[in-house]
Protein backbone atom coordinates (compact mmCIF):
# COMPACT_ATOMS: atom_id res chain seq x y z
CA UNK A 1 0.00 0.00 0.00
CA UNK A 2 1.35 3.40 -1.03
CA UNK A 3 -0.01 6.90 -0.58
CA UNK A 4 -0.59 7.28 -4.32
CA UNK A 5 -2.73 4.10 -4.41
CA UNK A 6 -5.06 5.03 -1.54
CA UNK A 7 -8.68 5.60 -2.47
CA UNK A 8 -11.95 5.80 -0.52
CA UNK A 9 -13.95 2.60 -0.02
CA UNK A 10 -16.55 1.86 -2.68
CA UNK A 11 -19.79 3.68 -1.82
CA UNK A 12 -18.15 5.90 0.77
CA UNK A 13 -18.33 9.01 -1.41
CA UNK A 14 -21.38 10.04 -3.40
CA UNK A 15 -21.00 11.88 -6.70
CA UNK A 16 -21.46 15.66 -6.48
CA UNK A 17 -24.80 17.07 -7.66
CA UNK A 18 -24.51 18.33 -11.25
CA UNK A 19 -26.85 21.29 -11.53
CA UNK A 20 -28.42 22.66 -14.69
CA UNK A 21 -28.36 19.29 -16.48
CA UNK A 22 -32.02 18.63 -17.25
CA UNK A 23 -35.42 18.28 -15.62
CA UNK A 24 -34.91 14.68 -14.51
CA UNK A 25 -32.06 15.58 -12.19
CA UNK A 26 -34.33 17.78 -10.08
CA UNK A 27 -31.80 20.60 -10.43
CA UNK A 28 -32.31 21.60 -14.06
CA UNK A 29 -33.09 25.00 -15.60
CA UNK A 30 -32.58 27.42 -12.68
CA UNK A 31 -30.23 24.97 -10.93
CA UNK A 32 -31.68 25.52 -7.47
CA UNK A 33 -31.20 29.30 -7.60
CA UNK A 34 -34.83 30.32 -8.03
CA UNK A 35 -35.91 33.01 -10.52
CA UNK A 36 -34.07 36.29 -11.14
CA UNK A 37 -32.60 38.43 -8.39
CA UNK A 38 -29.03 39.19 -7.40
CA UNK A 39 -28.35 35.76 -5.89
CA UNK A 40 -29.36 33.97 -9.08
CA UNK A 41 -26.71 35.77 -11.16
CA UNK A 42 -23.17 34.64 -11.79
CA UNK A 43 -20.97 36.27 -9.15
CA UNK A 44 -24.10 37.50 -7.42
CA UNK A 45 -24.26 37.95 -3.67
CA UNK A 46 -23.37 40.51 -1.05
CA UNK A 47 -20.29 40.82 1.10
CA UNK A 48 -20.31 39.40 4.65
CA UNK A 49 -21.91 41.84 7.08
CA UNK A 50 -23.95 43.67 4.41
CA UNK A 51 -27.49 44.32 5.66
CA UNK A 52 -29.20 45.58 2.51
CA UNK A 53 -28.30 49.23 2.99
CA UNK A 54 -29.25 49.34 6.66
CA UNK A 55 -26.39 50.59 8.82
CA UNK A 56 -24.43 47.38 9.56
CA UNK A 57 -24.00 46.14 13.13
CA UNK A 58 -20.22 46.58 12.93
CA UNK A 59 -20.67 50.31 12.27
CA UNK A 60 -23.61 50.77 14.68
CA UNK A 61 -21.47 49.62 17.60
CA UNK A 62 -18.84 51.98 19.05
CA UNK A 63 -15.13 51.55 18.51
CA UNK A 64 -13.15 50.43 21.54
CA UNK A 65 -9.62 49.67 22.64
CA UNK A 66 -6.38 49.84 20.72
CA UNK A 67 -3.35 47.68 19.93
CA UNK A 68 -0.28 48.62 21.91
CA UNK A 69 2.66 49.28 19.59
CA UNK A 70 5.00 47.91 22.28
CA UNK A 71 3.27 44.52 22.05
CA UNK A 72 4.30 44.34 18.37
CA UNK A 73 7.99 44.28 19.35
CA UNK A 74 7.67 42.23 22.56
CA UNK A 75 8.08 38.45 22.68
CA UNK A 76 7.26 35.83 25.29
CA UNK A 77 10.07 33.29 25.67
CA UNK A 78 9.35 29.94 27.34
CA UNK A 79 11.83 28.56 29.82
CA UNK A 80 12.29 25.45 27.68
CA UNK A 81 13.40 27.62 24.73
CA UNK A 82 16.38 28.93 26.70
CA UNK A 83 17.98 25.50 26.23
CA UNK A 84 18.31 26.28 22.49
CA UNK A 85 20.65 29.17 23.26
CA UNK A 86 24.36 28.35 23.26
CA UNK A 87 26.43 29.90 26.04
CA UNK A 88 25.78 30.70 29.66
CA UNK A 89 24.73 34.35 29.26
CA UNK A 90 21.30 34.84 27.72
CA UNK A 91 20.34 38.29 26.47
CA UNK A 92 18.19 39.62 23.62
CA UNK A 93 20.97 39.26 21.04
CA UNK A 94 21.64 35.66 22.11
CA UNK A 95 17.93 34.87 21.64
CA UNK A 96 18.00 36.44 18.16
CA UNK A 97 21.14 34.51 17.18
CA UNK A 98 19.50 31.23 18.28
CA UNK A 99 16.34 32.11 16.26
CA UNK A 100 14.20 31.97 19.40
CA UNK A 101 12.83 35.46 18.65
CA UNK A 102 12.64 37.36 15.35
CA UNK A 103 14.92 40.26 14.45
CA UNK A 104 12.30 43.00 15.01
CA UNK A 105 11.80 42.09 18.69
CA UNK A 106 13.07 44.74 21.13
CA UNK A 107 11.78 43.36 24.45
CA UNK A 108 11.41 39.81 25.75
CA UNK A 109 9.95 38.21 28.84
CA UNK A 110 10.86 34.75 30.13
CA UNK A 111 7.85 32.76 31.34
CA UNK A 112 7.64 29.48 33.25
CA UNK A 113 6.85 26.84 30.64
CA UNK A 114 9.09 23.81 30.28
CA UNK A 115 12.23 23.18 32.29
CA UNK A 116 15.84 24.29 32.34
CA UNK A 117 18.58 22.00 33.62
CA UNK A 118 21.79 24.00 33.19
CA UNK A 119 22.67 27.17 35.10
CA UNK A 120 22.32 30.29 32.94
CA UNK A 121 22.65 34.03 33.49
CA UNK A 122 19.70 36.00 32.13
CA UNK A 123 20.67 39.57 31.28
CA UNK A 124 18.41 42.49 30.42
CA UNK A 125 15.22 40.44 30.05
CA UNK A 126 12.04 40.57 32.09
CA UNK A 127 11.38 37.37 34.04
CA UNK A 128 8.20 36.13 35.74
CA UNK A 129 8.25 35.01 39.38
CA UNK A 130 7.90 31.33 38.49
CA UNK A 131 10.61 31.48 35.82
CA UNK A 132 12.92 33.34 38.21
CA UNK A 133 12.49 30.60 40.82
CA UNK A 134 13.16 27.85 38.24
CA UNK A 135 16.30 29.55 36.89
CA UNK A 136 17.68 30.11 40.39
CA UNK A 137 16.80 26.52 41.37
CA UNK A 138 18.91 25.31 38.42
CA UNK A 139 21.82 27.37 39.75
CA UNK A 140 21.41 30.32 37.40
CA UNK A 141 20.96 34.02 38.12
CA UNK A 142 19.10 37.03 36.76
CA UNK A 143 20.82 40.35 36.07
CA UNK A 144 18.67 43.38 35.31
UniProtKB/Swiss-Prot annotation:
The keyword rRNA-binding applies. Gene3D superfamilies: 3.100.10.10. One of its GO terms (biological process) is translation. Residues 1-53 are annotated as: Disordered. PROSITE patterns: RIBOSOMAL_L15. Residues 21-31, 42-52 have a biased composition (Gly residues). One of its GO terms (molecular function) is structural constituent of ribosome. One of its GO terms (cellular component) is cytosolic large ribosomal subunit. It comes from the Bacteria. The keyword Ribonucleoprotein applies. Keywords: Ribonucleoprotein, Ribosomal protein, RNA-binding, rRNA-binding. SUPFAM superfamilies: Ribosomal proteins L15p and L18e (SSF52080). HAMAP family: Ribosomal_uL15. Belongs to the universal ribosomal protein uL15 family. Part of the 50S ribosomal subunit. Binds to the 23S rRNA. This is Large ribosomal subunit protein uL15. It comes from Shewanella amazonensis (strain ATCC BAA-1098 / SB2B). The gene is rplO.
Amino acid sequence: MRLNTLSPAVGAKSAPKRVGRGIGSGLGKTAGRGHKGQKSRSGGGVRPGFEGGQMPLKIRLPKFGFTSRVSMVTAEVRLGELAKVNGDVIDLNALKDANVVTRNIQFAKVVLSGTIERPVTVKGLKVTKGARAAIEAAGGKIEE
